[in-house]
Design a protein with these regions (language model features):
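Class I SAM-dependent methyltransferase "Motif I" SAM/SAH-binding loop
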Residues: 22-24
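Glycine-rich SAM-binding Motif I of class I
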Residues: 26-30
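Class I SAM-dependent methyltransferase SAM/SAH-binding core
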Residues: 31-68
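A short acidic, Gly/Pro-enriched loop at the edge of an enzyme's catalytic core
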Residues: 70-79
Length: 140
């Protein structure tokens, strides 16, 4: 598991209700479910990633956080996690506000865009690189 996921897991208390927004293949969800005994749900925009999660026995719905977080009641989760996904949204402020509304606590992580290799790639190619931690194209 990525070091970042271990840090996130340390911030979450056992047996709490968690929503993982942009949960990808469900790696963090699996870890929290098995090691923290969380009641965890996921929201993911990619149909194939949703299917991967469901195949692992995880509860995930397909949806776009910019629109679909509005369907969740206020403070319906103890924690809402947004890991390495904020940069993909057209309206990140809206998403952050929805995270804070839906969860009692929000945990948000972002890629380190200051890392010299990422900056060099951006300078030379004009796009963000595709890496192990950012495997999808999310930029225009």
């Amino acid at each position: 598991m990525k070091n970042e996921f271990q840090v996130i897991a340390e911030l979450i208390e056992k047996e709490k209700k968690v929503l993982d927004v942009g949960c990808g293949d469900g790696t963090l969800m699996e870890f929290l479910k098995n090691n923290k005994k969380t009641n965890i749900r996921g929201l993911e925009i990619s149909k194939s990633k949703v299917q991967e999660c469901i195949a692992k026995g995880l509860t995930v719905i397909e949806g776009n956080a910019e629109k679909d977080l509005a369907q969740f009641p206020d403070k319906s989760f103890d924690y809402v996690v947004l890991s390495q996904t904020l940069q993909a949204f057209l309206n990140p402020e809206l998403v952050i506000n929805e995270l804070l509304r839906v969860g009692k606590k929000a945990i948000v992580t972002i890629p380190n865009f200051g890392y010299w290799r990422i900056r060099l790639h951006l300078l030379l190619k004009g796009t963000m690189p595709i890496t192990k931690t950012l495997p999808d194209e999310w930029y225009n």
